[in-house]
Amino acid sequence: EVVNNLVKDSDYVINFAAESHVDRSISDPEIFIKSNVLGTQVLLNAAKEYGVEKYVQISTDEVYGTLGETGYFTETTPLQPNSPYSASKASADLVVRAYYETFNLPVNITRCSNNYGPYQFPEKLIPLMISNALEDKKLPIYGDGKNIRDWLHVYDHCTAIDLVLHDGKLGEVYNIGGHNERQNIQIVKLILEALGKDESLIEFVDDRLGHDRRYAIDSTKIRENLGWEPKYTFETGIKETIQWYLDNQDWMDQVKSGEYQEYYKKMYLK
């Protein structure tokens, strides 16, 4: 009923709502199925009922699984999710596709690479490393730290979504990637250098279950068909992001209070 009341007077639905942290999905898969799959179905029903102009599903490159040392995910790469989180997102994508094919609901799906930027919660790599470094805490790095991610600034992600919303061809999937591949350990060392902290803070911990080795997105389709180009280089974006967290430590402290402390102890202080 709450969702219906929100959707009935809306022109568009853009579904950002999700449980999104892989670590949490390993410890509690059920909430990911409920939120990410069943929650999507509730939104789709409301969008169908009230005839929205378009429904856009915000998804992730993790639905494709993992890559070797070369190659990129394209929109036609088979879905091979390896974690409860990515499985829930892949399932939701398929439900969205079914509503397009069955009910002619006007939809698009976007699949992005790893986001970074202001207001990201400290369970994610970049804000977690910044936060711990500022407090001279150990920086926990899974495995050998050489897992590779393709980093996309949140501003560039939003401009891409706006293009898909207004110009995307109905029923199509669009990959959104920053073409900024970095090993996790490279990111951590960069943050330490920017903050003037010693690399002795780095602590390698047991690797995460089902940890995908490499993600990298081919965003040719959205670039050529919709004219999207990212504004941020990684060098500029990470510098601005670090400064944002330095300037907004009160926000970070508030976010880290309460339940987050229990989560951190469970994940990293075993």
Question: Where does each model-flagged region fall?
Answer:
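C-terminal substrate-binding subdomain of Rossmann-fold SDR/epimerase-dehydratase oxidoreductases
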Residues: 127, 133-270
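Conserved donor sugar-nucleotide recognition element shared by glycan-biosynthetic enzymes
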Residues: 84, 92, 122, 184, ...
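The catalytic Tyr-centered alpha-helix of NAD(P)H-dependent dehydrogenases
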Residues: 81-88, 118, 122-126, 150-154
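Hydrophobic alpha-helix immediately C-terminal to the catalytic Tyr-X-X-X-Lys motif of short-chain
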Residues: 91, 95, 99, 129, ...
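Short, glycine/charged-enriched secondary-structure capping and boundary segments
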Residues: 7, 27-31, 69-73, 122-130, ...
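Gly/Ser/Thr-rich beta-alpha loop segments that engage phosphate groups in nucleotides
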Residues: 41, 67, 88, 119, ...
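N-terminal Rossmann-like NAD(P)+-binding domain of SDR-like oxidoreductases, especially those catalyzing
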Residues: 1-115, 240, 245-248, 254-270
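Conserved active-site region of classical short-chain dehydrogenase/reductase
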Residues: 37-45, 123, 155-158, 162
